[in-house]
Design a protein with these regions (language model features):
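Glycine-rich phosphate-binding loops of nucleotide-dependent enzymes
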Residues: 1-244
């Protein structure tokens, strides 16, 4: 579905990505991990069109999207959430999600956009009493739900999730994990960046590890956790799937 071929990106003298080869297969939940500054968010930004690669290319459904702007990448079926929760603060939650419904993929346009926005807010678990509340009056957890609903409103084929569990309690994290599983069941392929290894290892079909902008490992969660290089530069110790 998605293929990055030799993708490199520099910011001044800093090589954020170094000839990264990377794939995401249809219907999988793929994980992208690595130390801070390893290039994870930069790679998501290249895929979503925020940054253009200095070399290499990004293919989506066998089409080169490397030079497309973010709104055109979105129109192809790739939508990204951000680490920092973003919204239109003076618009209601419903209006925020409507922006996604109205400006999503052309073939996915709805006959009743308001009802679609309501359904998505219900799907992500936002209280109906908050539908007509300005986004600036929501807490962080509620804003994350709205951001996710707005992303889903564009009818993505591939959803990029950048650290969606940041700032959540264990209970809220469990709810978010269940929601990610439900999204995949709806036929959406997912690529997620996350620092909570227990989540990545429990959710993902395949995991890719970046370090200093280079891919150092790729495989099943168990293969990645047992890779000596990954343990050395990132995990610190071998990850146990049976730890509480």
């Amino acid at each position: 579905m998605l293929e990055c071929v030799g993708v490199s990106k520099k910011f001044g003298g800093l090589e954020a990505l170094k000839k990264v080869d990377f794939t995401v297969n249809k219907n999988e939940i793929a994980g992208l991990v690595g130390p801070n500054g390893s290039g994870k968010t930069t790679l998501l930004n290249v895929i979503s069109g925020v940054y253009k690669p200095d070399s290499g290319k990004v293919l989506f459904m066998n089409e080169d999207i490397s030079k497309l702007s973010p709104h055109l990448v979105c129109s192809k079926g790739i939508t990204k959430t951000s680490q920092s929760v973003q919204s239109f603060p003076d618009m209601t939650t419903l209006e925020n999600v409507l922006t996604g419904v109205l400006f999503g993929r052309e073939e996915a346009k709805e006959h009743d956009p308001i009802r679609k926005a309501e359904e998505l807010l219900e799907f992500v678990g936002l209280d109906q009493q908050k539908f007509n509340v300005p986004a600036k009056n929501l807490n962080v957890v509620e804003l994350r739900r709205v951001q996710l609903a707005r992303a889903l409103a564009t009818a993505p084929k591939l959803l990029l999730l950048d650290e969606i569990l940041t700032g959540l309690t264990p209970k809220e994290s469990d709810e978010a994990i269940a929601l990610v599983k439900l999204i995949r069941e709806q036929g959406v392929t997912i690529l997620m960046v996350e620092h909570v290894m227990k989540v990545i290892m429990g959710l993902c079909d395949r995991v890719t590890v970046l370090h200093h902008g280079e891919k150092i490992c790729e495989g099943t969660p168990e293969e990645v956790c047992n890779d000596e290089n990954v343990v050395k530069v990132y995990l610190g110790k071998k990850f146990s799937f049976y730890e509480d």
